[in-house]
Amino acid sequence: MIITTTNGIEGKRVVEYKGIVCGEVISGVDFIKDFAAGLTNFFGGRSKSYEGELIEAREGAIREMKERAIQMGANAIIGVDIDYEVLGQGGNMLMVTASGTAVVIE
């Protein structure tokens, strides 16, 4: 399956629009990661624990979106957008949403 942020796929023709498709992942951030990230921020550099959490959440949202597109009979997703949102009273949850248009291409 082709998944792209563009509104079309070069050399391919959209023959059917199946509809909007989304995937969502909500992930909690724990105390140890917060502490490690705080040390990283204090000493400078990148927080590998948070980066790993972001990558895992993004890949999960894309995977879920892809599975839903397959269920709709699509073989591609165009116009993909990925959004990140911090949730919870203490900002201790991360929501990643991937959305796009499920299509059939040839």
UniProtKB/Swiss-Prot annotation:
Stretch forming the signal peptide: none
Name used for this protein in its record: UPF0145 protein Cthe_0398
Chain coiled-coil ranges: none
Organismal lineage: Bacteria, Bacillati, Bacillota, Clostridia, Eubacteriales
NCBIfam families: PRK01119.1 (NF002224)
InterPro entries per the UniProt record, alphabetical: UPF0145_dom_sf, UPF0145_YbjQ-like
Disulfide pairings: none
Family, as annotated: Belongs to the UPF0145 family.
